[in-house]
Amino acid sequence: HLATWYDVFEKAQNQGSELWFYTVGIFQKGSYPNKTVDVPLIESRILHWLNYRFGLKGYLHWGFNSWTDDPFAAPGTHRGDGWHVYPKTDGLINSLRWEQMRNGIQDYEYLWMLEDKIRKSVAGPGERLSIIELSRRGVEIASRIVETMDTYNKSPDTLYEVKKQIINELLDLDIAPQIIVQTNPLEHSTVANDCAIDVFGWAQPGTKVVVNGHSLPLSDDGLFMENVSLSRDNTIVVEAEHEKGKKRIVRSFEVLY
């Protein structure tokens, strides 16, 4: 239902409603990520990448310990959808699915940390916070794992590579020159041939910003904005130079010929 009627739900989000999502175990053969025992384990982790990718605030579990008479041998019609842990005489036994759910929540926290770091970087007087979309970079990165609600990457190697990218970008924001680069459309979007990209962002005062070879002026607040054609390799290359250092930032796009 969320994917089918997402436009309606998104409108409610924009009006201030908090949106969570839910999966049903009996549909585990569908194309959406799930957390039952008979789907790839990484899907339990991907659920929270989907949360960040679409601005959702939570995931509703049908049950934590709603066991069958023998949860070890009889997962039930919903294939373990009603529990993430197993019973023992003196407590609970953890599960791999529960651990991956925890890892997915921690991945979400890394994306939130990146958003918070961007917020702190651009905080101050002027129009910075009205122009910079704080979650935009995290959404771009998360889209490498979750492209749509039913199109997602199940490769653990790719997930770890993307998580490393989040960590590197978090650390990079502490290194001069500080710069936030955003594009419209988002990085990794599919665009028409000869399409121009809106490039905008913020850089710390005194930074020289060059985008695909064109020098851009900065406002008193450090804001910049320009409509730029893609390079031959379908990228936007932003070079930032300051007396304290240099940076080179690349944003890539898919081109439809």
Question: What residues fall within each predicted segment?
Answer:
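Catalytic-core regions of glycoside hydrolase
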Residues: 1-68
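Generic signal for short, ordered secondary-structure residues
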Residues: 29-30, 90-93, 188
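Short secondary-structure transition/capping segments
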Residues: 32-34, 71-75, 217, 221-224
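Short, structured secondary-structure boundary patches
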Residues: 39-44, 78-86, 229-242
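Catalytic domains of carbohydrate-active enzymes that cleave complex glycans
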Residues: 56, 71-177
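Extended hydrophobic-aromatic, low-complexity segments
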Residues: 70-71, 192
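Ser/Thr-rich low-complexity repeats and stalk/linker segments
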Residues: 176-257
